[in-house]
Swiss-Prot record:
It comes from the Bacteria. This is tRNA pseudouridine synthase D. Belongs to the pseudouridine synthase TruD family. It catalyses: uridine(13) in tRNA = pseudouridine(13) in tRNA. The active site is at 81 (nucleophile). Residues 157-303 form the TRUD domain.
Amino acid sequence: MNELELLGPRAYGEALGRAVLKATAEDFQVDEVLDIPLSGDGEHLWLWVEKRGLNTEEAARRLARAAGVQLRTVSYAGLKDRQALTRQWFSIQLPGKADPDLSAAQDDTLQILKSGRHKRKLQRGAHAANGFTLRLTQLDADKDALNQRLETIARQGIPNYFGAQRFGYQGGNLGEARDYAARKALPEQRAVRSRLLSTARSYLFNRVLAARVADGSWQKAQVGDLLAFTDSRSFFPAGVDECSDPRLAILDLHPTGPQWGEGPSPAGGATAALENTVADDESVLRDWLVRAGMEHERRILRLPIGRLTWHYPESDILQLEFVLPPGCFATVLVRELIDLVPVGQTDSSCVF
């Protein structure tokens, strides 16, 4: 499957050109934002770690080996990309133990920048946001058009699609999920099960969002919508009055789409009709999610781009800096601007 099939239409028109992303790890930098002051004592050792060309799970395994503990005692808030320079927190549970020597875990791909003790372990999803610095190199695009589109995005946000990375190479994760769903089976390995269930939910969400981008309703509240604030998982129904809430205009409040689970869509009106139609069209995936015990959740359809700035360090480089909530994809912003080409290739666009 290609990117258009996995995500959906762009909100602001065709790509304005093309560029390369991730020619080096430094071209894609991620800093986890965690608003948790450490207590200074406790059985959990928290580590601020810089990784280069190393994903989160590999880093956790390396820390566990160096500390001489089981992998399950190492915790992290979120998964970060391998092809990037990332800084994120880990915690290691060490009841009654001194701080271990972690030098064996460190090399050119992993450095511990600071550490401290805390009374609790680091919970999944505990980070407040992710800060990004992206460098798009070999840029071939009109800068005036790019600047205008970036200004529009800063004012209006972008569709909050799950990025193509969620679905694996050419949508391979979705193919695996469909195979298990058709057999009414679940993977035995917990990590595989989680990955494929997330893939299926993400695809159904993207189908709904794609339809609302196509009809122009993705950033507008309509009666029957369920509305949520940017940083909240709770939601409330939209009536006539809620559809004119001024917080919609300033990108604090947004319509939401389904993270599918048990039961029909809790939305109403045209929103429920669309969501249930998508679920009925993909009934095998929907029923698989329900049998797996997934609960219905919501995700905002519109993604505000926090603290968005940009400049051109060189004539063929665009540098973007911005902040996104957890679980949102930086590459979805890039997609609204340009097509990406693989490193060393300039004659055709890359599905990314």
